From Swiss-Prot:
Component of the ribosome, a large ribonucleoprotein complex responsible for the synthesis of proteins in the cell. The small ribosomal subunit (SSU) binds messenger RNAs (mRNAs) and translates the encoded message by selecting cognate aminoacyl-transfer RNA (tRNA) molecules. The large subunit (LSU) contains the ribosomal catalytic site termed the peptidyl transferase center (PTC), which catalyzes the formation of peptide bonds, thereby polymerizing the amino acids delivered by tRNAs into a polypeptide chain. Keywords: Cytoplasm, Ribonucleoprotein, Ribosomal protein. Residues 106-118 have a biased composition (Basic residues). Component of the small ribosomal subunit. Mature ribosomes consist of a small (40S) and a large (60S) subunit. The 40S subunit contains about 32 different proteins and 1 molecule of RNA (18S). The 60S subunit contains 45 different proteins and 3 molecules of RNA (25S, 5.8S and 5S). It comes from the Eukaryota. Residues 91-118 are annotated as: Disordered. One of its GO terms (cellular component) is cytosolic small ribosomal subunit. Its main location: cytoplasm. InterPro entries: Plectin_eS10_N, Ribosomal_eS10, WH-like_DNA-bd_sf. One of its GO terms (molecular function) is RNA binding. Belongs to the eukaryotic ribosomal protein eS10 family. This is Small ribosomal subunit protein eS10. Pfam families: S10_plectin.
Length: 118
């Protein structure tokens, strides 16, 4: 299928930014939910990248879930002229959130284990 170059570029840029694309299986939908192009163009462009091994596809409940592979990151980086330091959001490692630590008090009084036996 012939997809206009500017639409293909929008799809590839969004895929590289996010690392994941979700598309509803509705070929007649006039516009994709997140990318400013037709839904059919998104599905077919990502289907092409899947056949080349740049994207992994999962289908569930009438939605396509496309995930970028390592080869896909390199391919899009060369195609879109993106420097080495920039990665998709799914590839960035976030610092683990600090969990609140419980207070270390003495032994608990009362309760199930603290009952005196008669």
């Amino acid at each position: 299928m012939l997809i206009p170059k500017e639409d293909r570029k929008k799809i590839h840029q969004y895929l590289f930014q996010e690392g994941v694309v979700v598309a509803k299986k509705d070929f007649n939908q006039p516009k994709h939910d997140e990318i400013d192009t037709r839904n059919l163009f998104v599905i077919k462009a990502l289907q092409s990248l899947t056949s080349k091994g740049y994207v992994k596809t999962q289908f569930s409940w009438q939605y396509y879930y496309y995930t970028l592979t390592d080869e896909g990151v390199e391919f899009l980086r060369t195609e879109l002229n993106i420097p080495e330091g920039i990665l998709p959001l799914t590839r960035l490692k976030n610092a683990p959130a600090e969990r609140p630590r419980p207070s270390r008090g003495g032994p608990r009084r009362g309760g199930y284990r603290g009952r005196a036996r008669d």
